[in-house]
Amino acid sequence: MKIQKKLTGCSRLMLLCLSLELLLEAGAGNIHYSVPEETDKGSFVGNIAKDLGLQPQELADRGVRIVSRGRMPLFALNPRSGSLITARRIDREELCAQSMPCLVSFNILVEDKMKLFPVEVEIIDINDNTPQFQLEELEFQMNEITTPGTRISLPFGQDLDVGMNSLQSYQLSSNPHFSLDVQQGADGPQHPEMVLQSPLDREEEAVHHLILTASDGGEPVRSGTLRIYIQVVDANDNPPAFTQAQYHINVPENVPLGTQLLMVNATDPDEGANGEVTYSFHNVDHRVAQIFHLDSYTGEISNKEPLDFEEYKMYSMEVQAQDGAGLMAKAKVLIKVLDVNDNTPEVTITSVTTAVPENFPPGTIIALISVHDQDSGDNGCTTCFIPGNLPFKLEKLVDNYYRLVTERTLDRELISGYNITITAIDQGTPALSTETHISLLVTDINDNSPVFHQDSYSAYIPENNPRGASIFSVRAHDLDSNENAQITYSLIEDTIQGAPLSAYLSINSDTGVLYALRSFDYEQFRNLQLKVMARDSGDPPLSSNVSLSLFVLDQNDNPPEILYPALPTDDSTGVELAPRSAEPGYLVTKVVAVDRDSGQNAWLSYRLLKASEPGLFSVGLHTGEVRTARALLDRDALKQSLVVAVQDHGQPPLSATVTLTVAVADRIPDILADLGSLEPSAKPNDSDLTLYLVVAVAAVSCVFLAFVIVLLAHRLRRWHKSRLLQASGGSLTGMQSSHFVGVDGVRAFLQTYSHEVSLTADSRKSHLIFPQPNYADTLISQESCEKKDFLSAPQSLLEDKKEPFSQQAPPNTDWRFSQAQRPGTSGSQNGDDTGTWPNNQFDTEMLQAMILASASEAADGSSTLGGGAGTMGLSARYGPQFTLQHVPDYRQNVYIPGSNATLTNAAGKRDGKAPAGGNGNKKKSGKKEKK
C-alpha cells in the first residue's frame, strides 16, 4: 500500500509533505490512500495517526473516529497501531460499477477539537470478473441474396472490471462466408459486427455455426463465448427502415409507472412476412431492460419501474426493427432523466451533548450535525436552521457540516430543558425539509438565594401561652432544584432583656414553624423583633434573612386595682363627708382604679353593689364618681355604708370592690358626737350568716301563713258587710283607721294611715280617700332619683268582689328594684341590674300579706312585731330599736307591687297637698318636695 501523490521529485515531495501537514492542522487537507478490491478484512490501508501528526495512543484519548454517511463502514481505525484498515471485503464493482477511478470518501473526526479531515481511498480493480454475453446462443436468419459486405451487429460482451481487466477484444470462429469487424463506439465500449464476405447459398449450407469469443486484458486472460446460429432463407431485398436514426426524449424522474415515453417506427416496403416489422432492444444493459418495456408490435417504450435521477441520469439503448425475412434496421434511443425534488434532506447528528450546566459560557458546543440531499442542483442545496427564540445558533463548517453552540448563558430557573428542532430544507420547488430534535437538559447550579414569601412578617401570640405552643410559620422558596433548593430555617441569635433569643423561641429547621419556649407576659414586654434565616443546601450555600415582629396580645389576667380610697392598714374604712344640705348630684367622692391590662381588658366600669340606704347615692358608670341621687333628709342616718364594685371588660371579666363610709352631717360637732358609731362592724362569720338566713326564711314563712289567714278573714268580712249594706240600705260614715307596715328588706317602719269610705243607700258607688301617712320608706332606682306623683284609687276598687279587677294597671317599670335593693341580707345581693322586685306573683302576694298582717296587728294593738310604743315594727327581730323621732321622713311614694294604688305620706297632707288622682299610671315630677 502507498499514498499516491501527484507531484514527483524530492523537493516536490518535501513541499507536499509540508503542505499536507499544514492542511491537516487546519482541518481542510485531503488524505489519499489506495487499496485493491477484494482485500481481506483488517488489511492495512494507511498510517492515519502519522498523517494526522498524532501518536497511536492519542487516537482514543482525543476521540479520533471515522465519520461516514449513509452506508456501512468500509474502513476502521486500529487504535493500537494508529493505522487505517479495511472493515470488510470490498467489491469495487459493487461500489462504483464502471466508474473510474473508484473513490471512497469519508471524514476523520478529532472530537476534542471538533475538526474534520477528509480522506479519499481509491479502490483498485483486479481481474476478478469474466466477460459475459447476455445470451448464450444467438439465432437469426439471413437471406441468401444478401450481398457481401452486409454487416450484422452482434451482442457485445460485458465485463464488470475496468481498465485492462475489462473486455479488450472479440474473436469469431473461422468461416469462409463471415468475418468479424470490431467498431470502437463513441461512448467507449466496442461493438462487434459480423461482415458477410461472400454470398450465401442455402442449398450448399442452410445453417452456419459460429462462436464469438470476448476476452479481457487481465493476467491471466478471462474470456466468454456466444454461440451463433445463422439460418439461410430465401431472398428479401428490402430491409426495415426507421423514421429517425436517433430518438431523444427528456423524462422527469417521478413519471408514473407504465407511462408511454416514446414510440419508434420502422417501415418495410416488402409484402407479407417480409414486410412485417417487429421491434426489440439490441445490445442494452440488463438494468435498462428491467426498467423499460418495448412493445414488439407497436414500438412503444414505457417504464416498468420508477426512474431515479440519482441512479441514472441518462439511458441509452438501441432498438432493432426486423422484418419477417430477417432483415433488420437499428435506431438509437436516448432517454434523459430530469431531476425533481423528491428527496428530503438527510440530517445526521454526529456528536451531541445531552446535558449542560447553566453557567457554561456562550459558544459551548452542543452537537455536530451533517446534512445531505441526494437531489442535484438547487434541489440538492440545503440550508439548516433552528428556531430564533432559542439561546442557540448553528455555525456552518466544511462539507455541509454544522455545529450547534450556545449563543448566551442559559438559566435553568427560566427554562430547565430544551427540545431543539433542527430543520434542514432544500432549494427545490416545492422545497422539502426534514426536522431532527435534540433534547438538552440544563443542569442546575446554586445561583439563587432562598426568597421568603413576604418582605417581613408579623405574628401574634396571647400572653400566658403554654410552653411549646406553635406561634407562627414562615416559608421560603428557592428557584434552584434538588439539593440547591433544600431550605433549612434558623433564628439569628440575639439578646432580649439579658437573655438569648433561643431561651424564648425555637424554629423547626425543616418546616419553619416557630415555637414558644416560655410563657410570655404582656406586662413584661409587648413585642419581640427577631430575624429568621433561610439557607439552602447548595455548594456554596446561599441564605437570606427576614424580619419577624412577634406581638404579645394582652389577656385579662389582672383584676382592677383600686387606688382611691386606699385600704388602711388597720382594716378600717375611710370616711367621706356629705353635708345634709347637699343637692342631688353632689359629688361626695370618686373611686379611682386602674387595670394593668390593656385595651378592652382595661376598660373599667363602676357600679354600686350595696348601700345601707338604697337610692341615696349613685355611682358614675365610667367615672367612678359617687354622687347624691336625691336630697339628704333629716331621717337619713349619719353613717352611710357603700360597696362599690369596679369591673373590667375582659373575658371573663374581673372585678374588685371597695367599701366607702359616708358621714352625713352639716356641722362638725354632729360628726364628733357620733364618731364612735362610725367604727366598722366586725364581719359576721359564716355561721352567723347561716343563722340569719334560717331565721329570715322562718319569719317569711310565718308571715305568709298569717297573710293567708288574714286574707280569708278579710274576704269573708267584706262579703258579710256587702250583704248588710244591700239589706239595710244605710250608709257608713267611716271606718276605723288601719295600720300598714312598709318593708324594705332592712328595716320595717310602723306607719299609720286613715281612710274614709262614703256609701249611700241608693248608690253602690263610693270614693276612697288615702291621706298621706306620717312617713314612707322609699326605694329609688339607681338610674333615677325623680319623685313620683301619688295615685288615687276610684270606687271601682271597692265594688262587689264578683267584679274582676279588669282595670288594674301593670306595675310601673320605673319602680323596679336593682338586685342590690331587694330585701334580704347583704350577702345575697349581686350585681345584676336587669331584674325587677318582686320577681314573681308569689313574692308580690307574700309582701302584701306581710303588710296586711302588720297593719292588722297594729290596729288591734296586739302587735308582737313592734318593739313598743313609738318604735319601728320588726325592730326587735331585725335590728336595734330606734324611736320614730330618729326616723327621717323620706316624703316619697311607696308603691306596692301587684296593686294600682299608691300610699301617700301624711306629710303631704300636712303640707296642704291634695293627693293626685290617677288610673294606675304614675306621673313624674321633676320638682323637689318642700319640707
Curated annotation (Swiss-Prot):
Annotated GO biological process: cell adhesion; homophilic cell adhesion via plasma membrane adhesion molecules; nervous system development
InterPro entries to which the protein is assigned, alphabetical: Cadherin-like_dom, Cadherin-like_sf, Cadherin_C, Cadherin_CBD, Cadherin_CS, Cadherin_N, Protocadherin/Cadherin-CA
Membrane topology label: Single-pass type I membrane protein
Subcellular location: Cell membrane
Name assigned to this protein: Protocadherin gamma-A1
Disulfide cysteine pairs (residue numbers): none
Residue intervals passing through the bilayer: 693-713
Its biological purpose: Potential calcium-dependent cell-adhesion protein. May be involved in the establishment and maintenance of specific neuronal connections in the brain.
